[in-house]
């Protein structure tokens, strides 16, 4: 199913019974968070708050609150179909030379499809139907959520930040939270390894005294939003990838105050600049860890212009102790990650980011072990292959007879196949999410790998245990008797 814009997606979800219109007055201060949190935990619908207290702009929440809705947003009917998207990304990330003329012809349609999905730039766009500039800019007119009692201020959460480095052809899309600190100022919290921060750093090195142009799209179409959180190869723009997901070219328009291109059908666009050296204390905020994070300094984004559609919809979320929307996104994107990892490590059978692990802090890998030390190679590969996993603290590796998504299986493997000293890998002084207050130094901490695989000769001198398995003939006989036994 193709969704041209957020409104098209809302309509499609409503027809499926996946969206609920909330007509009662609900405050964006704390109340929306509580309602969305309860709804998400019951795997409930997306919520369109039509009467936010004190505002005349509707708020869309819990949009990606189930893996199924994430799949729909990526153009799939089921989460299992996301594996095919992962296979495409794996191919584009590391394309193999054709093995012959026939193989070359078979791959040609893929390349043609990618080339055909170059974004389309419009002269006029719905996102610029209304233009607010200068002293009329007032972010307090947008119903930005204040999510938790201890939060420092209202927080923009689903802002799609568009940047471009001075030495790069392509633009970068990233989702970074933004603390509102005035009618026209927000704090741009981007971590140092993220694309927006890297672009800004390059700009400051080349133009240390010039303001850096930035645009933030609020309420883009689902494919563009999700394209920004997917491990897209550096050779492919997020806009082109969104076109592949959607099945049609992403439509853009030039920002009014810069050369940046923004989604033509976004509900709201913030345009402005970051002045090198202008920083502010950000936080504290309740985060996806379930705790309030420390205060840290980040650049200030000055909003010089707000453009929006007529009767815009504000798209928002909250983060908190899992499950929350980032955790649900992690569950769905699991299916995208698996083929990408398998491309580099064919021995991997499954890969799982348990939502209880705060989206990415713990990973479970099942594999077909082939030699002593193989599990350690795989765990090191997980940490280093995709930048999405550089902050993963714990990697558990098991054999392929274990279900990575069943803690009963995983814990059994850990307790029966591991010696704590021999089978634990500790790595010190590695990059850690600065939100992780458990690390001894902000941004720097350790990682642990757990080898819960069967041990091969060379890894142990002992006779290894054989798993207990019932006689298949006995199981078949009991299957035949089961109804007669009257047990259930």
From Swiss-Prot:
Binds 1 prenylated FMN per subunit. The keyword Metal-binding applies. It catalyses: a 4-hydroxy-3-(all-trans-polyprenyl)benzoate + H(+) = a 2-(all-trans-polyprenyl)phenol + CO2. Its EC number is 4.1.1.98. It comes from the Bacteria. It is an enzyme of class 4 (lyase). Prenylated FMN binds at residues 175-177, 189-191, 194-195. Mn(2+) binds at residues 172, 238. Pathway: Cofactor biosynthesis; ubiquinone biosynthesis. Gene3D superfamilies: Single helix bin, UbiD C-terminal domain-like. Its cofactor is prenylated FMN; Mn(2+). Its main location: membrane. The active site is at 287 (proton donor). GO terms for molecular function: 3-octaprenyl-4-hydroxybenzoate carboxy-lyase activity; metal ion binding. GO terms for cellular component: cytosol; plasma membrane. It is a peripheral membrane protein. Keywords: Cell membrane, Decarboxylase, Flavoprotein, FMN, Lyase, Manganese, Membrane, Metal-binding, Ubiquinone biosynthesis. It is found in: Cell membrane. InterPro entries: UbiD, UbiD-like_C, UbiD-like_N, UbiD_bacteria, UbiD_Rift_dom. One of its GO terms (biological process) is ubiquinone biosynthetic process. Belongs to the UbiD family. Catalyzes the decarboxylation of 3-octaprenyl-4-hydroxy benzoate to 2-octaprenylphenol, an intermediate step in ubiquinone biosynthesis. Homohexamer. This is 3-octaprenyl-4-hydroxybenzoate carboxy-lyase.
């Amino acid at each position: 199913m193709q969704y041209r814009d957020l409104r098209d997606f809302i309509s499609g979800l409503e027809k499926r019974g996946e969206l609920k219109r909330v007509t009662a007055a609900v405050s964006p201060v704390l109340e929306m968070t509580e309602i969305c949190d309860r709804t998400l935990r019951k795997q409930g619908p997306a919520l369109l708050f039509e009467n936010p207290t004190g505002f005349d702009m509707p708020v869309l929440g819990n949009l990606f609150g189930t893996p199924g809705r994430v799949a729909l947003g990526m153009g799939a009917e089921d989460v299992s179909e996301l594996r095919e998207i992962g296979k495409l990304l794996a191919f584009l990330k590391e394309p193999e030379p054709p093995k012959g003329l026939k193989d070359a012809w078979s791959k040609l349609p893929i390349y043609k499809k990618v080339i055909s999905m170059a974004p389309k730039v419009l002269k006029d766009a719905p996102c610029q139907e209304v233009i607010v500039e200068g002293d009329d800019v007032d972010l307090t007119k947008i119903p930005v959520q204040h999510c938790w009692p201890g939060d420092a201020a209202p927080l923009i959460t689903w802002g799609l930040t568009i940047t471009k480095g001075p030495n790069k052809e392509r633009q970068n899309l990233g989702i970074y939270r933004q603390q509102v600190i005035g009618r026209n100022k927000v704090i741009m919290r981007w971590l140092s390894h993220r694309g927006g921060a890297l672009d800004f750093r390059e700009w400051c090195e080349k133009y240390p005294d010039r303001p850096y142009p930035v645009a933030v799209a609020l309420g883009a179409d689902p494919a563009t939003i999700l394209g920004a959180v997917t491990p897209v190869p550096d050779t492919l723009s997020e806009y082109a990838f969104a076109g592949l997901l959607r099945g049609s070219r992403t439509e853009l328009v030039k920002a009014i105050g810069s050369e940046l291109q923004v989604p033509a059908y976004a509900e709201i666009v913030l345009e402005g600049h970051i002045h090198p050296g202008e920083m502010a204390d950000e936080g504290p905020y309740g985060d996806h860890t379930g705790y309030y994070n420390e205060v840290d300094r980040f650049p200030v984004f000055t909003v010089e212009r707000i453009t929006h559609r007529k009767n815009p919809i504000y798209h928002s979320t909250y983060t908190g102790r899992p499950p929350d929307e980032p955790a649900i996104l992690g569950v769905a994107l699991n299916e995208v990650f698996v083929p990408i990892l398998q491309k580099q490590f064919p021995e991997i059978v499954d890969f799982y980011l348990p939502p209880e692990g705060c989206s990415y802090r713990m990973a479970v890998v099942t594999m077909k072990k082939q030699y002593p030390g193989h599990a350690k190679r795989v765990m090191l590969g997980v940490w280093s292959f995709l930048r999405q996993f550089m902050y993963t603290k714990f990697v558990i590796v098991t054999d392929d007879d274990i279900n990575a998504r069943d803690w009963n299986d995983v814990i059994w493997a850990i307790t029966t196949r591991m010696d704590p000293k021999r089978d634990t890998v500790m790595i010190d002084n590695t990059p850690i999410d600065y939100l992780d207050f458990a690390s001894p130094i902000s941004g720097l901490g350790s990682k642990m790998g757990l080898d819960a695989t069967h041990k091969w000769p060379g890894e142990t001198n002992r006779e290894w245990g054989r798993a207990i398995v019932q006689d298949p003939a006995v199981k078949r006989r009991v299957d035949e008797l089961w109804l007669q036994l009257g047990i259930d």
